């Protein structure tokens, strides 16, 4: 089914022809590009679909002002000039062009012919594995009739929180039912095609945003395994200084560093955490190590990961095609099922049952039918953006619910070298630099496939195509910031709305992070560095950093992403300043627990999956004790 109108389609073809011209050996964008965009548009919520139409209408107005014709009727060179005015113009036009060109870049480079011409690996063929007999007895797809069942604990969500609670409880003999809104994909369905898998595995096709003084994408997994299925596999324990602060400032004495060690140990044993193998760090790791050494940095090397059998397929964030990454769809969920838990997929929970003031189950819908699960306890593990909405819909009125959102704002840069990089070979996020971690900046490898790499630069037209044709010599690396800014989540007209205002201190950290990253690149021998920063698209040498340092940057000048939403139902001992207690139970709501990123009290400055899993392991112990 077509999602674009005929006029929108014509306008997008005209944009594609200007943004993506033919290169020395890469073909130009065409109507086929727009065909792929059309399928992507279908994954967007209606407000974003309407926003796309508004952008195209605004483009026509701009064209009429400057060229007295609609955009599609302008010569290609004039179209490019109009778009360049947007690219170098005020923040509104710059952000509008980013929103317009990002799906076009993704769709255009999602083409096996382009990958072949660049020598990249486009997709992966995976041999399917037979499921064990118990699998079909424990996993249920869409319902074909109304059902009502009973258990001890019902868990909503199968990510880093829900899957861990389910496994830990099931292995103690507790009857557990897991309910997951997404589907249970196996590795044979992980094709290695990034744009395709993004639409299949991510909520809204990857188009979840925070809005404030700049739009920030926050991609969320929507599948069994949640975001663990589509994350990088990086494993950090919560820093001791963070745990100590929770103990000292929030009264969470049970989370003191020494108290949490056994839970980290248990999680890491299941995940089989180990350092990334040096031979799989690829060209990115090689040049970053060289640059870091040249600058005298000392705290850098292979990252800890949950993929001991990794062979460097390079598509961690789009479903591991070898099952080497021990995301919860591969580790904790099967362990829970083997221990007797049941799983319902493609089911959405809307109602939490309350009897006598206590949570007693849930009602979910699937395939037009109703699933009622009666239980002694309910665990909500929908993630930091969605858990508050479900709780609010079911009468939880905690003052802090939906507030205190931290996201670890992230940024990255590309660099061109004279040597082969071949970033598609090896672990995408396998290397780290911790020298600036005490400042709140953590560097981690961020090699991404061709189509996503091209969205990391605001370049359009011939310069963009020149960069794409040099992709085998392009490195990418990134970092995240331990944010002091805070946001909130809301539901407006049935739609998730995330608000987040990026503060000056975090903007300064992003600027500092980019500055040091450029120094690392140039020290490693980079010819050019590409920043996602207005006015500083391309740096030709380290001398160009002088102007960058003097620049008074604002949030809207930097393209920022985020992957770690936390804190929207945070833990604490005071019901006025938190949503759940130290046992993960919602204040004033017996039997109702929150076990996911929403529970994490503050930003932690590292990838949070191990933190969430360790807290979930502890939560399972507390829930089991409460059940008796």
Predicted regions span which residues?
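A conserved FAD-binding loop/helix module that cradles the flavin
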Residues: 602-623
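FAD cofactor-binding and catalytic pocket of flavoenzymes
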Residues: 231, 398-521, 554-556, 562-567, ...
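Extreme N-terminal leader/targeting segments of oxidoreductases
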Residues: 2-6, 19, 27-35, 39-46, ...
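N-terminal Rossmann-like FAD-binding beta1-loop-alpha1 element of flavoenzymes
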Residues: 151-178
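Redox-cofactor-proximal catalytic regions of oxidoreductases
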Residues: 196-276, 320, 476-486
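Glycine-rich loop(s) and the adjacent beta-strand/alpha-helix scaffold that form part
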Residues: 168-194, 217, 223, 338, ...
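Near-N-terminal "mature-domain entry" segment
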Residues: 1-70, 74
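Conserved redox-cofactor binding core of oxidoreductases
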Residues: 108, 118-142, 253-350, 359, ...
């Amino acid at each position: 089914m077509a999602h674009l109108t005929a006029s929108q389609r014509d306008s997008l073809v005209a944009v594609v022809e200007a943004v993506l011209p033919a290169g020395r050996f890469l073909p130009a964008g065409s109507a086929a590009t727009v065909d792929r965009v059309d399928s992507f548009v279908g994954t967007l919520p209606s407000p974003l679909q309407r926003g796309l139409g508004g952008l195209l209408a605004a483009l026509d107005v701009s064209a009429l002002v400057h060229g007295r014709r609609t955009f599609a009727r302008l010569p290609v060179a004039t179209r490019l000039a109009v778009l360049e005015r947007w690219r170098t113009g005020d923040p509104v036009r710059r952000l509008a062009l980013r929103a317009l060109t990002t799906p076009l870049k993704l769709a255009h480079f999602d083409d096996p012919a382009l990958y072949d011409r660049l020598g990249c690996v486009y997709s992966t063929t995976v041999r399917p594995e037979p499921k064990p007999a118990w699998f079909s007895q424990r996993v249920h797809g869409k319902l074909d009739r109304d059902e009502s069942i009973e258990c001890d604990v019902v868990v909503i969500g199968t990510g880093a929180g829900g899957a861990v609670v389910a496994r830990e409880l099931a292995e103690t003999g507790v009857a557990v039912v897991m309910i997951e809104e997404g589907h249970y994909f196996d590795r044979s369905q992980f094709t290695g095609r990034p744009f395709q898998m993004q639409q299949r595995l991510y909520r809204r096709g990857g188009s979840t945003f925070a809005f404030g003084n700049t739009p920030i994408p926050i991609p969320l997994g929507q599948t069994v395994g949640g975001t663990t299925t589509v994350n990088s596999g990086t494993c950090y324990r919560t820093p001791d200084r963070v745990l100590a602060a929770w103990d000292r400032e929030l009264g969470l004495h049970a989370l003191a560093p020494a108290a949490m060690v056994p839970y980290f140990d248990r999680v890491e044993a299941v995940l089989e955490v180990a350092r990334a193998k040096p031979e799989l760090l690829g060209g990115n790791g090689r040049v970053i190590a060289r640059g870091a050494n040249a600058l005298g940095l000392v705290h850098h090397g292979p990252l800890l990961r949950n993929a001991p059998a990794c062979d460097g397929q390079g598509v961690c964030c789009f479903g591991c095609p070898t099952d080497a990454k021990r995301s919860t769809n591969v580790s904790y969920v099967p362990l829970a099922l083997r221990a007797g838990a049941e799983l319902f997929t493609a089911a959405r929970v809307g109602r939490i049952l309350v009897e006598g003031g206590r949570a007693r189950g849930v009602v979910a819908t699937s395939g037009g039918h109703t699933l009622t699960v009666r239980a002694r306890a309910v665990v909500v593990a929908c993630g930091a953006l969605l858990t508050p909405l479900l709780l609010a819909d079911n009468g939880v009125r905690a003052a802090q619910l939906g507030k205190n959102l931290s996201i670890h704002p992230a940024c990255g840069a590309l660099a061109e070298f004279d040597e082969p990089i071949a970033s598609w070979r090896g672990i995408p996020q396998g290397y780290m630099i911790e020298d600036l971690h005490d400042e709140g900046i953590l560097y981690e490898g961020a090699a991404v496939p061709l189509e996503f790499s091209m969205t990391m630069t605001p370049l359009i037209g011939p310069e963009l195509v020149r960069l794409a044709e040099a992709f085998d010599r392009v490195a990418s690396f990134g970092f995240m910031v331990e944010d002091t800014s805070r946001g909130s989540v809301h539901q407006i007209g049935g739609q998730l709305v995330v608000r987040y205002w990026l503060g000056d201190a975090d903007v300064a950290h992003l600027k500092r992070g980019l500055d040091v990253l450029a120094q690392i690149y140039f020290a490693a021998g980079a010819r050019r560095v590409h920043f996602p920063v207005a006015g500083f698209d391309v740096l030709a040498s380290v001398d160009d950093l002088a102007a960058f340092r003097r620049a008074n940057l604002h949030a809207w000048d930097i393209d920022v992403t985020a992957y770690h939403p936390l804190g929207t139902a945070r833990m604490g001992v005071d019901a006025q300043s938190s949503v759940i207690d130290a046992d993960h139970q919602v204040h004033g709501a017996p039997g109702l627990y929150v076990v996911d990123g929403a529970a994490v009290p503050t930003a932690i400055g590292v990838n949070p999956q191990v933190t969430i899993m360790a807290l979930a392991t502890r939560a399972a112990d507390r829930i089991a004790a409460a059940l008796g």
